Amino acid sequence: MRVLVFPSVLHSGQIHSIDINKDNSKILTSGLDKEINVWNLQEFVQLTTEGKDTVKDDIENVKPLLRITAHEDLVNIVKWCPQNENVFVSGDIQGKVYMHDISKNTHELIFPFGWKEDGTSRVVDLAWSDDGRMLAWSSGDCKIHIYDTEKATYQELTSLSNLEKLTVQRSIAFDPTNHYLISMGDDTSIYLYQYQYEPTTRNYQFRLINRISKLINKTSMNVDYKRISWSPDGEYVSVPTASKNQTSLISLLSRSNGWNNILSLVGHNLDCEVVQYNPMIYNSSENNDNPKLFNVIATAGSDMTLVVWNTTKDKPIFILQEISKKPIVDLCWDKTGNSLFVASLDGHLSIVSFHPQELGNTVSEELWKELFEAGEASIKPFNEKPDQDITPSTKKSSHNVIDILDQKNSINVHEAKAKKPTEGIKDLSSISPEEENADTESPLKQDLQAHDKQVTNFVPEVIPAIIEDAPETQTEDILHSAMSTTRSTKSQVKNPKEKPTKVTPEKAKVTTKNGKKRIQPMLISSMNENSSNNSVKKSNTSESNGTSNLVSSGKVLMEFDKPSYSISDDLYKQNKRTKTQDENSNKKLKRELEPVKFIGSVVLNPSTTFARIRLSIPKIRLNFQLSSTVEDNSFILDVKNGLGNETKPSRITYFKKEKQIWCDFIPRFIQLVAEGSTFWAVSTADGQILTYSHTSGKKLLPPIILGSPLSFLESHGNFLMAVTSIGELYVWNIEQKKIHLQSPSSLSSLLDLSNKYQEDGLSKSDNITMCSITNNGIPLITLSNGAGYLFNKDLGTWQTISESWWAFGSHYWDSLGNDDGSKPQSYGLFCDSNDSSIVGLLEQKTNESILRKTRAGRGKYFNKISKNMLMKEGFENLENTISLSHLENRILCCELLGEFKDFHDFFIIYVKRICELGFKAKLFEVCDQLLGPSEPNSTATKDGEANWNSEICGIKKHDLLKEVILSCAKNRDCQRILIHFGKKIGVIDIDEFN
C-alpha cells in the first residue's frame, strides 16, 4: 500500500466531489472555483507505482485534460453516467443541473427548465441509475427530483413520503440491480423506494417500501455531505453516522434480511459521513467450491481520518489519521478496486494504492453471476404490500391503497421549455404538497375517489348536530357539555333526497324533540366572522352512531381539556369567603388551629443553604492510586469505590510492593486523598474527613464532619487543609490535634473581588487555579485573573502576594523565574531545596494568566500601556514607584511565609534602590527599625524592648544593618544617614572618624 497526497491545491482550495468513469480512464473533480476538471486517471495511478525520484518530475506534468466552466457558482457534485464513458452530470449550490458530453463538447441545462431562472435550492446529492436512464438528486428545499434521460421527463418523488414536515435528504443512491433508490435525511430517517419499468409503455413507477428510523439517534446538523453506498451485488447498503446510544456506528443493511441491520462497524465518533464500497467482491478462500466472501469498505469524514474495513472483521484493515487538514467529503474507488481517491476541503487530492491481491482474491465471473441471480430472486414483487406500515397515522388512506408515482403524470421537459410560464406551467418551487399529491395519484386511487364522489353527493352546507336528551345520571356541568360538542365524531349517511337545514352564522340552531326546545351551543368567535369567510367544503360521510361530523370552515376548532381541581389546601383556605361582621362587634374571632403535617422537621444550616459561593466538587472515580511522597515510592494507597452504602462499601488499602500493610472499609464514596508527614487523610462525598497513621492505619481522629462535600484537600508536613464546596476553609495541626486556623469569610471575599455591577448585570467571576498549603500551615490561593493570596492567621484575613499590576510596571518582575522547565509548578511548595521560592511560583502563575488573556504576549501588551502612561503629566515616576511597591510587598510576604533567603535578597535590593533614588526618609526608617532601642536609660526604650525582636526571618537585625551600611556606602547622597547609624552600631570608629 502506498499513499500519495497530490501537492497542488485544486479548485481554489476546496474539492467537493470526485468520480471515475465507466472505462476507468478519466476522473472528475469539482469545487470552489466553479470549474469541473477532467483528468487522466492513469497518470495518478502511475504516480503511486513509481519511485521517489521520478515521482517529483511526473507530478509537475499532471494537468487536467479539460476545464469546463458551465456553472456560475460552487460545483458540489459530479457523477459519470454508468453506461457512457463520456457523459456526466453536475450540480451546484444554485440548484442548476447540467449534463455534459465531452465527446461532443456539449453542456445542456436540464434543471431548472429554460424559462425558470430563480427560485431553486442547492443540489445536495445526485445519483444515476445503473442503466443510465434515470437521474435523481436531492435539493435544499427538502425535495427529491427524478429526471428520465430517455424520455426527457421530470417529476418530484417527495410526495410518496406523506410527511407533514419534510427534511433535507443528505444522501441519495440507486442500487446496482435497478430496483431500489435509498435516501437519508436530516430527520435521522432512511427512506427506501422501489421502482420498476412497465413492460408496455416503459414508464417508471416508484413506491415507498420502507422507512427506517431506529438506526440513528442523533445526527450532526453542521455537516453538508453524507454518502450512502451500495455493495457491488446490491445485497448490502452502508449507512454512515448511525448511532446506538452514545456509540457511533457504520450500519450495514441487508436486502435479503428485510432491510435489517446485520453488521455494525465501530471506529469513528460522530464524524464519519462518507462511506464507499469497493467495486469488487473478494474471496478469502482460494477454493471456489467453499467461498468465504467479503467486501471492502472505505470510510472517512470530518475527523480527517481514513479507515478501510473488511466486512468479516471487527477491526479495520488500517487507519490513516490526519490524512488531510480539513474534512474529507468524498471517496471514490477505481474499477479495479486497487486505487482509492480521497477528496477533502483543503484542496488536496489523495491517492491510496494497493498491490494486486493485497486486499484479497477477487471472485470469478461465474460466482459473480450466481450472486446476482440469487439477489434477483430475493427481490419482492413491485405490487406486494410492505411488511410494515410506513405511512404516518395522520396520512393513512381509507382504502388501503399503495401510493405509486407514475411517469405518466410527469412533466415533459421539452414541452415545458417551449411554453412560457404564463401558459399554465407552474413554478416548481410553488407547488404545494396537496397539489403535487393530486397530480401524482395512481389510476386505481383516482377511480376509487370518483366512486366516492358518486356515493356521497352532498350539498356543501353546514348540517348542525342534533342534541339529544341527556340521561338522568349525566352531570349538568356546562363545561363538560360544551367540551363534548367539540370532539370529532364520524358522520352518518343521510338520504340524498332529504334537504339539509341551512344555518347562518348569526343565528343559533333551535331544534324541537319530544316537545322540548334544544339550542345548539355556538363559539363566540364564530359570531364575529364575516359571512364571506364562511366558505364550507364538501365532506365525505360514513355510517356512525347518529352524530354528524363538524365541517371545517377555514378554521380548525381548538380542543381543550377540563381544568384540574387539584388545588392545594392553603390556596383553598385563602380564597374562602369570610363572614362579614360589623365594625362595632366585640365578638372575639375564633383562632383556627394550624394542622401539623410534619413532626421533627430538620433545621437547615443557613451557611449551607444560602451560601454566597458554590465551588465545583470532583467527580467520584471508580478507583485511583496515590504513591507516597514521604516514604519510598513503593508505598501506594489504593482506593476502590463501591456503591456508597453498606451492601458494597468502598475499600482503602495501603501497599508496599504489592504487599498489603493495612486496609479499611467505608460505606461512603471517597473523593479526595491527601498525605502528610505522618498521616493519610481521606474525604468522603458527604463531607467527612478520615485520618489514618502511616505505619499501621490507626485512626488518629474521629471522623471530622464539615457538612458539605470538599473541593480541595491538601496537606504539607503536620498541617491538613480542607476547602468545602461552599468556600469554607479549615486548617488543622494533625500532630497536635488542634485547629490551626479558620477563615470566617471563607473564600467569598476573594471570589467577590472581581464581581463588578454593570448596566447589564454582574460580570463573570474568577475561578481558583491553585489551592495549596505551606509547611508552616499558611494557605495559598491563586485565581484565574493572575492574583495570588495568602491567609494571615494573626490578622484573620487574606493578603495579596502577586497581581498583574506589578507585572505592568515593576523592574523586578520575573527576577525569580524558574528556568528549569522539567520541574513542576508547585515544586517550590513541596521541596526543601534552597532554590525554591513560593513568591516566584505565584508570580509565575500570574504570568500564565496574563498570557492566556493577551494573544500578543505580556511584553508587547504592557510595553504599549506603559509608554502611553509615562507620556502623561504626573506619571514620570510611575515605574520607580511601582517597582518599590513591588519590592516592599515581596519583603513583607517573605517575612510572613518564612522565606529567609528571598527576604535577605529582596531587602538588600530594596535598600540599594532607595539609596539610588535618594529616598532618605525611607532609608532612615529602615535603619532605625534594624537598630532598635539604643538608649538603655530611657523609658521609651524599656517599653520598646518588650515588642522589639532582635531577629527578623532568622537574621540578626544588627548584622543586617551592618550589611546595609556597607552595601550602600558608595551612594554619596545617603552617607550622612549611613555614618549616623554606623557610629551607633560600631561599624565606624568615632575617634578615627573625628
Swiss-Prot record:
Keywords: Chromatin regulator, Nucleus, Repeat, Repressor, Transcription, Transcription regulation, WD repeat. The keyword Acetylation does not apply. WD repeats lie at residues 10-49, 70-110, 118-157, 164-203, 220-263, 276-319, 323-364. Residues 413-445, 482-550 are annotated as: Disordered. It holds the Pfam family HIRA_B. It comes from the Eukaryota. The keyword Disulfide bond does not apply. Gene3D superfamilies: YVTN repeat-like/Quinoprotein amine dehydrogenase (2.130.10.10). Residues 482-492 have a biased composition (Polar residues). Residues 414-426, 495-509 have a biased composition (Basic and acidic residues). SUPFAM superfamilies: WD40 repeat-like, YVTN repeat-like/Quinoprotein amine dehydrogenase. GO terms for cellular component: chromatin; HIR complex; nucleus. It is found in: Nucleus. GO terms for biological process: chromatin remodeling; DNA-templated transcription; regulation of DNA-templated transcription. Residues 525-545 have a biased composition (Low complexity). One of its GO terms (molecular function) is nucleosome binding. Required for replication-independent chromatin assembly and for the periodic repression of histone gene transcription during the cell cycle. Belongs to the WD repeat HIR1 family. This is Protein HIR2. The gene is HIR2.
